[in-house]
């Protein structure tokens, strides 16, 4: 739902802010904060890239990524807890609280990012063409081969990986 996406983005933004603040304190500690700096790095590893992938999966206009990042970063402490504000920054058109319960479909960017040996440019081409994860999962090898930069090897790799991911989800192995 829109609420789920907004909540994930809210948490990712809070993690980004807390990490930034802790990093400032660690810089003041100098060499005495080295161990703590390593622990913080371990805790937040991958959080920034996950944040960007979730944004790319759900923002209304993928070309607005820089604007969305800037607006989320500039939200004040009182507005970061407002899921409606976060949803609207993402371009998800939330006008009342009930709109937060609307179903929303990802583009498939995160799913494609899990396909080994798939370049970012290929991910952009495929996700822009298919617009949603269900459309992407329904694509055949032939459909994918028609896209620029996606040959038979990549097309087969994508379809096999997406099928494997779908099986893992339906089997309850992963929760997304």
Residue ranges and their predicted role:
Residues 2-146, 152-176:
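Long, highly charged, low-complexity intrinsically disordered interaction regions
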């Amino acid at each position: 739902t829109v609420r789920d996406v907004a909540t994930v983005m809210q948490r990712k933004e809070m993690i980004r802010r807390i990490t930034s603040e802790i990093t400032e304190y660690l810089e003041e500690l100098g060499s005495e904060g080295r161990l703590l700096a390593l622990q913080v790095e371990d805790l937040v590893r991958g959080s920034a890239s996950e944040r960007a992938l979730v944004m790319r999966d759900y923002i209304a206009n993928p070309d607005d990524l820089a604007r969305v990042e800037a607006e989320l970063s500039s939200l004040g402490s009182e507005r970061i807890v407002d899921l409606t504000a976060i949803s609207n920054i993402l371009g998800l058109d939330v006008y009342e609280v009930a709109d937060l319960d609307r179903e929303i479909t990802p583009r498939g960017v995160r799913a494609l990012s899990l396909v080994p040996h798939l370049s970012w440019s290929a991910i952009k081409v495929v996700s822009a063409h298919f617009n949603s994860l269900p459309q992407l999962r329904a694509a055949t090898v032939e459909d994918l081969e028609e896209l620029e930069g996606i040959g038979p090897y990549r097309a087969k790799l994508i379809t096999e990986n997406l099928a494997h991911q779908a099986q893992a989800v339906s089997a309850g192995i992963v929760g997304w």
